[in-house]
Design a protein with these regions (language model features):
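N-terminal secretory signal peptides that target proteins for export/translocation
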Residues: 1-8
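Bacterial N-terminal signal peptides
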Residues: 11-24
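Intrinsic disorder/low-complexity segments
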Residues: 5, 14-16, 186
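Extracellular/lumen-exposed scaffold segments
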Residues: 29-281
């Protein structure tokens, strides 16, 4: 028995040594939660599927505070992230849940979120057979009466045995607008886009089909140099709404004809995104 116990002890020590070597190969778990004035931010991870890992950044805002979408509207700062310092991570992409329009207090409107928002991330591993650590630097802005920039550094060890937050990430991904073709018969949908050349500057007239009377539409240019205004809505019969948007905010010297615009239509809990070219005059 004593010999068996001794052997068991040596085997246990050997197992611990091997386990220790494996754990030493993994970076220590760093902070997954950070706080800034008006918000707290959490980095979470879900399931690992081959080289793909679901993750997310959740921003939980204090009452009366807001943060911004990828296109902030008339004012604001869009979120940005970097993953330098990550280990065994080849790439990270972010998805954007459907936003809302808010008054910015200065006569304009901003686009973003109140309460809480979880940005789904898709993480690509360089080698799925090796330990991985996700390091995220997240720059964003939070606003109450005034806006302030914020930055948090978050990290976590990606664990194939984890995934307890998979349901939260999946629920957030379900709120990301789905791609849809122009003129689709589904609801919601963007039915048509026309150019009104009688107006100065020219304006886009966009007809959409929606079920919610508070349905809203947002327009983005092909790159960050475009600063398009927010479309204004007129309700029409049979669940159709018309949005009008001056073709303003186009970069100097750029002919907008044919440029791809991204239209995001938010219809209550449903949202779609449609890419359309600017019509020719």
């Amino acid at each position: 028995m004593l010999r068996t116990l001794a052997e068991s002890g040596r085997m246990g020590l050997a197992a611990l040594s091997i386990s220790g070597l494996w754990l030493a190969a993994l970076p220590a778990r760093a902070d997954t939660l950070a706080k800034v004035p008006g918000a707290e931010v959490e980095l979470i991870a879900g399931a690992v599927e081959g080289v793909q890992v679901d993750a997310g950044i959740e921003v939980r805002l204090a009452p009366g505070w807001k943060t911004y979408w990828r296109y902030p509207g008339d004012s604001g700062v869009p979120p940005a992230l970097a993953f330098e310092g990550s280990q065994n991570v080849a790439g990270v992409s972010i998805a954007w849940p459907a936003p809302k329009r808010f008054s910015d207090g200065g006569g304009g409107f901003s686009i973003g979120y109140k309460g809480a928002v979880l940005f789904p991330l898709k993480v690509e591993l360089a080698d799925p057979g090796k330990p991985a650590r996700l390091q995220i630097a997240f720059d964003f802005a939070v606003c109450e009466a005034l806006c302030m920039p914020a930055k948090v550094d978050l990290s976590l060890v990606i664990d194939a045995a984890g995934g307890e937050d998979a349901a939260r990430i999946a629920a957030a991904r379900a709120t990301v607008p789905a791609a849809q073709a122009l003129g689709a018969v589904d609801t919601p949908s963007v039915r048509s886009v026309a150019l009104d050349t009688a107006a100065t500057p020219h304006r886009l007239v966009i007809e959409v089909k929606a079920t919610n009377p508070k349905a809203d539409l947002f327009a983005e240019g092909p790159d960050a140099h475009w600063a398009l205004p927010l479309p204004q809505k007129t309700a029409l019969p049979d669940g159709v709404a018309r949005f009008v948007m001056p073709l303003d905010g186009v970069p100097s010297g750029v002919d907008p004809t044919g440029a791809p615009l991204t239209l995001t239509l938010v219809d209550g809990p449903k949202a779609i995104t449609t890419t359309v070219p600017v019509p020719a005059p």
